[in-house]
Regions:
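N-terminal anchoring/stem segment of glycosyltransferases
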Residues: 1-66, 79-82, 208-211
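A structural signal for well-ordered alpha-helical segments within the folded catalytic domains
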Residues: 19-22, 68, 72, 157-165
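Short, hydrophobic beta-strand segments that form beta-sheet elements in well-ordered domains
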Residues: 34-43, 87, 112-113, 181, ...
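GT-A fold catalytic core of metal-dependent nucleotide-sugar glycosyltransferases
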Residues: 57-59, 65-123, 136-137
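Glycine/small-residue-rich pyrophosphate-binding loop that anchors the diphosphate of NDP-sugar donors
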Residues: 126, 131-135
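Catalytic core and acceptor-binding pocket of nucleotide-sugar-dependent glycosyltransferases
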Residues: 134-218
Length: 219
């Protein structure tokens, strides 16, 4: 596969979450019409694959299940011809503003992620959490390869938890491997509950079942 742009956005889903994809795409087209979107197929239905036939679709054929395929999808996309930077977006992320400038914030050998303040407050036994709903990479970081391998070897709860456990509560290691991004690029549902949400976020992340209900109301 040969993509026309060096900076690409990437999302992905299977049959369980593909219902979010048309909603996600509509918002993406509204605020990022000139940007290239690649879609990772984690096991979508034939109907959905037909619906998105105008997009570049990458089948992720690996043993991981569901969201555990995310690091693998990022890894495979980063290796495509001409691609220099990749930004992963979960399908429950609502694009609410211009997002192309996020690529200006990438750092080599690091995962660009927003600090998950609600999770850090609620479950901080291993220090700061970083939310994996939006992940920015430049090139193919070694930490991404390790994360993808760990999601296959030790799939614990979710891909974000796997990365958190890999860091082992070592804040120095997090500084080495994680590039903190501004909260406007991943404002969480719980940020609103905790009254810490930024004004006019560019990406609103509707996490969990309550987030799903919010998305359904917008369909």
């Amino acid at each position: 596969m040969r993509l026309s742009m060096r900076e690409v956005f990437l999302t992905g889903c299977d049959t369980k979450t593909e219902w979010q994809l048309p909603w996600f795409i509509n918002n993406f087209k509204k605020f990022a019409p000139e940007q290239e979107l690649v879609i990772a197929d984690f096991g979508m239905s034939e109907e959905m694959l037909s619906h998105i036939s105008n997009f570049e679709v990458i089948p992720i054929i690996s043993a991981e299940k569901g969201w555990f395929k995310k690091p693998r999808a990022m890894l495979e996309t980063s290796l495509l011809y001409n691609v220099e930077k990749v930004c992963w977006l979960d399908t429950d992320c609502e694009i609410a503003g211009r997002i192309d400038h996020i690529f200006d914030l990438s750092e080599p050998q690091k995962l660009g992620m927003v600090k998950d303040r609600p999770w850090t407050r609620r479950r901080n036994d291993l220090g700061n959490w970083y939310n994996s709903g939006v992940v920015l990479i430049e090139g193919t970081p070694n930490i991404l390869k390790s994360w993808a391998n760990e999601c296959l070897a030790n799939p614990v709860i979710g891909d974000q938890e796997v990365l958190y456990l890999m860091m082992g509560g070592d804040e120095i290691k997090k500084l080495l491997f994680i590039n903190p991004l501004p909260h406007t690029y991943n404002t969480l549902r719980l940020d609103y509950i905790d009254n810490i949400a930024v004004e006019n976020p560019r990406i609103i992340h509707h996490t969990g079942e309550k987030g799903n209900n919010t998305i359904r109301k917008q369909l």
